[in-house]
């Protein structure tokens, strides 16, 4: 080939790189502004020509706008007492008047109220008169107004009113009325449902996105061709060292696979799985637990991958495969690319390789084994670092362009993807030097244009089905509602790490602190020594720059969660390998320095063990010390390591003053040979042993590993092990004959201090009532305080769990007058023969009761025990022993709960049981109340709820219940759930209730207004003392059927917006 031909090819390639790069860049940047097709939805009422109520719960809670027209003739036809003409929420819903719009006729007046504000009001006689033709109502961004057309006020102006406040737009869960019969002419309500996020790309936008992606690829290929002009060949795509496997490879990969099966999950797995399962029906990736159903964009492409995976299965093992893949690839990149790049001393060091592998595992285990994006970010940051280093090593720009792409996509996963940007910044100056050197040969634009296209092509993914306006609105909502914390509150992230909670647990502390220790040690040594044989200073400093840069960038992320530390897993492992070499005898010749590092490492271990061995939610089941500090023989492990730290520190001080003429001793060399891989390996064994112990202690009931293994045979997670009483009135035992007192068999012969109404007012199931009601406080807002008809033993106290007072008696010791010691011994109740389907005896009780539980261990209180008896002479029952109950809610004295007594704890020849209750305290708060014992009829939650009924699964529980059907939403309207599944009481109160509250745009804003929730009796099979959570059955407040929406389509530009969603209370 001639020189002119080569020159011509270069010119063509330069033009291709420039033009394709600019096309890719321009089209990518234009993508957010290009038009989309919106699915429009309108709620019109009445429907079917009849006056009936319909439901249409809006995921955004409020509409874009609402108009209504009510003929005044309807008021004339109402009974004298009046009624609801129309409303957007059922009148008996929780805080209905505070949230919804009502048009109500009273005996004397007709009022239009919206969110507890009287918009307009007129006397009923005026409205019913001939002068009034209709009531017109409009609620838009401009405000809410109503007019009685035909009527005038004393000033002669049209009678009406209103307020120019966009926050008065009412919540809509449907349209409800007290009217019946055919719909009269002129009655109409029309609401524009907010479906701004339900969009698909137009043909123009789709073509632009495809062209942008193709142009970027062409530009990168052209850039690669220009890279060849230096005449040097890059190493092969798959180098030789990738083809060999070592013992460390086997150990690390086996560790990843083993942890994938038996290991703990991350905190937001249920949250993310819930979004992924709902996305297909919704048409976009909505954050439907909060924030008014707004999309996750611009940080959501990884969740869309998970949504695609749900089409195959929702099982945990399948859904978490991307994280397993990311972990294994991280290790392969570390061992084959990163460690050799850090220098021959690091690559050749077996301790360094093991340090990298063990630190990667121990950082991965607490943070990166779930559905959260940290493992993908860890992989993306490592790939970016590898590509930057390869670009510098070979003076090529194509790897740098690919690094820009990986950094952009890593940032597109979550704001914490800034770690990949930190990798770009760390390598920025060397890359700029390469760019300056190469532009003299091929020019500037052929090099810059592909880079621009590479950095912006992510926009075609982020804005594939959303627009700039919708993403800005979603960002506004998340920022306004929060959490959205300022940069100067970054200290909270580290503060949470030292608290004795799951966020500050043993595993999470080690996962981050080992990285921090290695980082600061390496910085100190590298600053002290200008040259270290076998260590490449440039890559080493850039690695440290990545970590420091990430710590800086994390300040600007809106949330300060500890789980974000999972993104350090890969770079932290590389830092551990580098530090292992830096603190080796080959570099630190004086054993004093190495012993000082060992002392620091032991101090870090003591700090790690100075907390609980806690894991998130169900992952902690059966794990030793999951709520206390680990101990050995009564001595905390933290104390052991702290003692070792003191010894090592004293030894280091002694070495400082001892003579160095005789060299270092064998003890010092042995202790300081490889402390990092040994410490990390020890911690990996601790974590694995914790999970294995949990499996053994929990079997045959639920544990993470057992659940994962059952998935191969179609298991349904926790739903297979949670037992539900469909009807708690079933299973009550027959009392044996005898003479009873005024309380009947429950009170026995001589009850003292107990009465049928001895319970405080408004005592509800499994809940605390605090006045005034606090956010996160669980209370039954609609529970009656007194029955209209007395129960079987004269009690008027409402019973929990659906218990029928006409069949179930009650006896309580509460009184407001003079206090006395109260005692009760019930009649003997005949116990059925034992079988596997009836493992429990249950007593529904309330008050301050002594009992045992997994969480609280033993709780002191008054006595409620179950006494069991054997057959005696003459047919009498002879007491044979007593059982203290499993009481899950012992710290909630004002709560009904089910006290559990395991049949397996009773002798095989037990034939009868009775309740023995004693309230010996004279303090009014120390009351107790009991009902008769029963042997409950139970079914698994999977059998009872099934996989087709819509369920509101709190964000914490989703991964544990993969077979239940989440409540879906489409075209801006949600399904109406039949049940709610919550986590344990503490998590429900502090986490899910507050996060999903309607004030924050959560799903509870819908269910609270539209439904009533009733707690059901549930138990975790063979783990009777554990609070797994709760199942709540929803009951509709109003008789209504789902509304039919009027759907359509509209083409919208990228900057079109129907206005801000109402997010203020």
Swiss-Prot record:
One of its GO terms (biological process) is cell wall organization. Gene3D superfamilies: 3.40.190.160, arabinofuranosyltransferase like domain, EmbC, C-terminal domain, subdomain 2. It is an enzyme of class 2 (transferase). The keyword Membrane applies. The chain crosses the membrane at residues 15-37, 204-226, 241-263, 394-413, 417-436, 441-463, 510-527, 540-557, 567-589, 596-618, 633-655, 667-689. One of its GO terms (molecular function) is arabinosyltransferase activity. Keywords: Antibiotic resistance, Cell membrane, Cell wall biogenesis/degradation, Glycosyltransferase, Membrane, Transferase, Transmembrane, Transmembrane helix. It is found in: Cell membrane. It is a multi-pass membrane protein. It comes from the Bacteria. Its EC number is 2.4.2.-. Its main location: membrane. GO terms for cellular component: plasma membrane. InterPro entries: Arabino_trans_C, Arabino_trans_C_2, Arabino_trans_central, Arabino_trans_N, EmbABC_dom1. Belongs to the emb family. Arabinosyl transferase responsible for the polymerization of arabinose into the arabinan of arabinogalactan. This is Probable arabinosyltransferase B.
């Amino acid at each position: 080939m001639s020189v002119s031909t080569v020159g011509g090819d270069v010119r063509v390639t330069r033009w291709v790189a420039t033009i394709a790069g600019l096309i890719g860049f321009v089209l990518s940047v234009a993508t957010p502004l290009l038009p989309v097709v919106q699915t429009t939805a309108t709620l019109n009422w009445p429907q079917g020509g009849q006056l009936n109520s319909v439901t249409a719960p809006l995921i955004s809670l409020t509409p874009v706008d609402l108009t209504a027209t009510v003929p005044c003739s309807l008021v004339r036809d109402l009974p004298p007492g009046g009624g609801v003409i129309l409303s957007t929420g059922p009148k008996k819903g929780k805080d209905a008047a505070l949230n919804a719009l009502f048009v109500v006729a009273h005996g004397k007046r007709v009022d239009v109220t919206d969110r507890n504000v009287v918009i307009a009001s007129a006397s009923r006689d005026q409205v019913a008169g001939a002068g009034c033709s209709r009531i017109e109502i409009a609620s838009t961004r401009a405000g809410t107004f109503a007019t009685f057309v035909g009527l005038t006020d004393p000033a002669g102006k049209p009678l009406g009113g209103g307020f120019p406040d966009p926050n008065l737009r009412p919540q809509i869960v449907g349209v409800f009325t007290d009217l019946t019969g055919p719909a009269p002419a002129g009655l109409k309500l029309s609401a524009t449902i907010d479906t701004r996020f339900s969009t698909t790309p137009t043909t123009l936008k789709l073509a632009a996105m495809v062209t942008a992606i193709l142009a970027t690829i062409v530009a990168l290929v052209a850039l690669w061709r220009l890279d060849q002009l230096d005449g040097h060949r890059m190493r092969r795509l798959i180098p030789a060292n990738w083809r060999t496997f070592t013992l460390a490879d086997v150990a690390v990969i086996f560790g990843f696979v083993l942890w994938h099966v038996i290991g703990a999950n991350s905190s937001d797995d249920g949250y993310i799985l819930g979004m992924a399962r709902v996305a297909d029906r919704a048409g976009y990736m909505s954050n439907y637990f909060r924030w008014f159903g707004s999309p996750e964009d611009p940080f959501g492409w990884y969740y869309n991958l998970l949504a695609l995976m749900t089409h195959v299965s929702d099982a945990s093992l399948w859904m978490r495969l991307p994280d397993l893949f990311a972990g294994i690839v991280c290790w392969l990149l570390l061992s084959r690319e990163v460690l050799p790049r850090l220098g021959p001393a690091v690559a050749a060091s077996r301790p360094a390789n093991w340090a990298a592998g063990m630190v990667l595992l121990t950082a991965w285990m607490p943070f990166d084994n779930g559905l959260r994006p940290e493992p993908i970010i860890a992989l993306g940051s490592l790939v970016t670092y590898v590509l930057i280093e390869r670009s510098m090593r070979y003076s090529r720009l194509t790897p740098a362009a690919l690094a820009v792409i990986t950094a952009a996509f890593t940032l597109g996963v979550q704001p914490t993807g800034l770690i990949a940007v930190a990798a770009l910044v760390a390598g920025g100056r060397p890359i700029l030097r390469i760019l300056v050197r190469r532009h003299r040969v091929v020019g500037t634009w052929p090099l810059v244009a592909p880079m621009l296209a590479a950095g912006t092509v992510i926009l075609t993914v982020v804005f594939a089905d959303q627009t700039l306006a919708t993403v800005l609105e979603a960002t506004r909502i998340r920022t306004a509602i929060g959490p959205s914390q300022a940069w100067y509150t970054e200290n909270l992230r580290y503060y949470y790490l030292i608290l004795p909670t799951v966020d500050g647990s043993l595993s999470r502390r080690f996962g981050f602190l080992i990285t921090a220790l290695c980082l600061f040690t390496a910085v100190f040594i590298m600053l002290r020594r200008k040259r270290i044989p076998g260590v490449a200073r440039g890559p080493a400093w850039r690695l440290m720059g990545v970590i420091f840069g990430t710590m800086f960038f994390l300040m600007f992320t809106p949330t300060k969660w500890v789980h974000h530390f999972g993104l350090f897993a890969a770079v932290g492992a590389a830092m551990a390998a580098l530090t292992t070499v830096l603190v080796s005898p080959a570099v630190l010749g004086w054993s004093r320095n190495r012993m000082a590092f060992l002392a620091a490492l032991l101090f870090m271990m003591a700090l790690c063990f100075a907390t609980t061995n806690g894991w998130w939610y169900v992952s902690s089941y059966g794990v030793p010390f999951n709520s206390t500090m680990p101990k050995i023989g009564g001595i905390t492990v933290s104390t052991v390591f702290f003692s070792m730290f003191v010894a090592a520190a004293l030894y280091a001080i002694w070495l400082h003053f001892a003579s160095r003429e005789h060299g270092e001793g064998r003890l010092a060399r042995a202790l300081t040979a490889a402390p990092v891989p040994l410490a990390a390996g020890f911690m990996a064994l601790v974590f694995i042993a914790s999970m294995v112990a949990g499996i053994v202690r929990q079997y045959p009931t639920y544990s993470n590993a057992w659940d994962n293994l059952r998935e191969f045979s179609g298991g349904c997670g926790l739903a297979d092990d949670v037992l539900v009483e469909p009807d708690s009135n079933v299973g009550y035992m027959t009392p044996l004959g005898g003479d009873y007192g005024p309380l009947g068999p429950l009170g026995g012969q001589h009850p003292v201090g107990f009465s049928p109404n001895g319970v405080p007012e408004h005592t509800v199931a499994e809940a605390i009532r605090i006045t005034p009601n606090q956010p996160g406080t669980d209370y039954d807002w609609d529970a009656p305080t007194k029955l209209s008809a007395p129960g079987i033993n004269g009690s008027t106290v409402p019973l929990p769990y659906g218990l029928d007072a006409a069949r179930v008696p009650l006896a309580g010791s509460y009184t407001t007058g003079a206090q006395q010691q109260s005692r009760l011994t019930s009649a003997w109740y005949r116990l059925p023969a034992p079988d596997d389907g009836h493992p429990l005896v249950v007593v529904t009780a309330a008050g301050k009761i002594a009992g045992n539980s997994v969480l609280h261990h033993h709780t002191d209180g008054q006595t409620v025990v179950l006494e069991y008896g054997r057959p005696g002479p003459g047919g009498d029952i002879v007491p044979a022993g007593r059982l203290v109950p499993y009481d899950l809610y012992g710290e909630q004295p004002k709560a009904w709960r089910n006290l559990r007594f395991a049949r397996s704890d009773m002798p095989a020849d037990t034939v009868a049981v009775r309740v023995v209750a004693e309230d010996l305290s004279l303090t009014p708060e120390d009351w107790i109340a009991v009902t008769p014992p029963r042997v409950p009829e139970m079914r698994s939650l999977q059998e009872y709820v099934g996989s087709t009924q819509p369920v509101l699964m709190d964000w914490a529980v989703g991964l544990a219940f993969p077979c239940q059907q989440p409540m879906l939403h489409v075209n801006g309207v949600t399904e109406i759930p039949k049940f709610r599944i919550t986590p344990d009481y503490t998590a429900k109160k502090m986490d899910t209730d507050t996060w999903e509250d309607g004030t924050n745009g959560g799903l509870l804003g819908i269910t609270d207004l539209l439904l009533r929730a009733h707690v059901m009796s549930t138990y975790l099979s063979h783990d009777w003392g554990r609070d797994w959570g709760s199942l709540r059955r929803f009951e509709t407040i109003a008789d209504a059927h789902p509304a039919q929406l009027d759907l359509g389509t509209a083409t919208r530009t990228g900057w079109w917006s129907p206005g801000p969603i109402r997010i203020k209370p």
